Amino acid sequence: MRSAAACNNAGWCAAVSRSHGCPDTVDDAAWCSARRTPPYYPDAVTLRPDATPTDILDRIDTTSPGCSVKDSFATLDLTPDGFVELFTAEWIHRPAGLPAPASTALTVLTVRQVTTAAELHDWQSAWHGEDTPVDIFRPALLREPSVRIFTAHVNGDSGDSGDDRPAGGFVLTCDGDVVGLSNLFAADSSRRSDVWTAAITEAAAHCPGLPLVGYEQGDDLARARAHGFAPIGALRVWLHQPGQP
């Protein structure tokens, strides 16, 4: 299942990178982008535990600041190649058919699929959570057949009220084998568990019969476990240091 999760995540990273025009390659060892990817996104994702630095490093641009590698099985040592460990996390898996936990919120979240560039702009602004605009999620993503982006709104929020900002959101990537859950956020941290429940519900509706996968760390790993996910193995993200080989 960890291989399926890694492959699904590589597909999502590839979709984001394609929307920026990044040329990429994929084989049984890794997905790689020949040009620096958008912020927060890796330049390579390994797809098998025996992938080696040789499988990756000649296919990515280590000369540009921010170059990173997602080591999906936490088996690489990229220290000799000028990388440092940025963080570790756990792949997670939730079986298909497991009911979503009931929400304990006094007000229910309404979920909407993002379908327009304007809606994607609002989603991205809410996801980033800062005044400085970001350019990561571009409208071309809305044409990716495997990608579905969702906003969650508190019931009663509408354009008529003058405040239709998302209360939360998430991304589902359905590749036919598993559904990847990523980029989950809540504008109010007290609603984060409700957004998890909403994401599980939408995954079952849009990609029925498929297990959910993703990766988390810290408090969000604990929330994932509370919502029926189980850890299935570690991953590691490596960041290249400027001036290194």
What residue spans do the PLM features occupy?
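A short, well-structured alpha-helix characteristic of acyl/acetyltransferase catalytic modules
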Residues: 116-126
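N-terminal charged segments
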Residues: 1-63, 72, 129-146
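Conserved acetyl-CoA-binding loop-helix of GNAT-fold acetyltransferases
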Residues: 53-55, 186-206
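Terminal substrate-recognition subdomain of acyl/acetyltransferases
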Residues: 1-21, 34-36, 95-101, 173-175, ...
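Acyl-donor-binding surface of acyltransferase catalytic domains
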Residues: 47-117, 212-222, 229-241
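Alpha-helix C-terminal capping segments
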Residues: 56-64, 127, 200-208
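A conserved beta-strand-loop-helix scaffold within acyl/acetyltransferase catalytic domains
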Residues: 132-157, 162-187, 233
